[in-house]
């Protein structure tokens, strides 16, 4: 055995109970068909000892992360913010919901939000020169950033979604004949 960890440890690391149950059930049991995602009610209904395996199960953290990420994406913004509150207790719930609207798709477990949220909570220290593309100059870069800022400022808070932001920035690039990279 490697890395024996209790259920409580996984919960403390931000793994959802439904992901743990789903994953552990499939470690020793194979359902009929290809279905991998099961609700607790579905597991109870579908489970049979005849389909249980006697061979030793191999724990795969990547697979558990896949299950957990799936269940995280199924949560509503308020529900997910409430679950993440223990990892960012100093953040207001409405601000956390906004961060999660962007980062939700990238989370494998809830604990990861504390690291991913840092970019939204404080400006990182960086060298200004990294903003300037190789085939550009300071003036062109500043112009592009100002155009992007103006476009983003016109998007209402309730439309602050990944797709909306990408479309707005792509429009700035197209309308102003900017080079993307």
Can you describe what each PLM-predicted range is?
Residues 1-72, 174, 178-179:
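Alpha-helical recognition segments enriched in aromatics with Gly/Pro capping
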Residues 77-175:
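Small-residue-rich helix-loop
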């Amino acid at each position: 055995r490697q890395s024996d960890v209790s259920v409580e440890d996984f919960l403390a690391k931000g793994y959802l109970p439904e992901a743990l149950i789903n994953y552990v059930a499939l470690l020793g049991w194979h359902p009929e068909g290809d279905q991998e995602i099961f609700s607790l009610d579905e597991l109870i209904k579908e489970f049979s000892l005849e389909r249980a395996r006697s061979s030793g199960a191999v724990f795969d953290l990547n697979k558990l992360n896949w299950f957990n990420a799936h269940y995280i994406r199924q949560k509503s913004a308020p529900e997910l913010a409430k679950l993440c509150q223990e990892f960012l207790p100093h953040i207001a719930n409405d601000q956390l919901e906004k961060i999660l609207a962007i980062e939700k798709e990238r989370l494998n477990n809830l604990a990861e939000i504390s690291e991913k949220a840092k970019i939204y909570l404080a400006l990182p220290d960086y060298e200004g020169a990294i903003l300037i593309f190789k085939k550009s100059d300071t003036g062109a870069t500043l112009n592009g950033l100002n155009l992007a800022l103006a476009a983003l400022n016109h998007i209402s808070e309730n439309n602050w979604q990944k797709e909306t932001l990408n479309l707005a920035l792509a429009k700035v690039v197209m309308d102003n004949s900017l080079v993307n990279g």
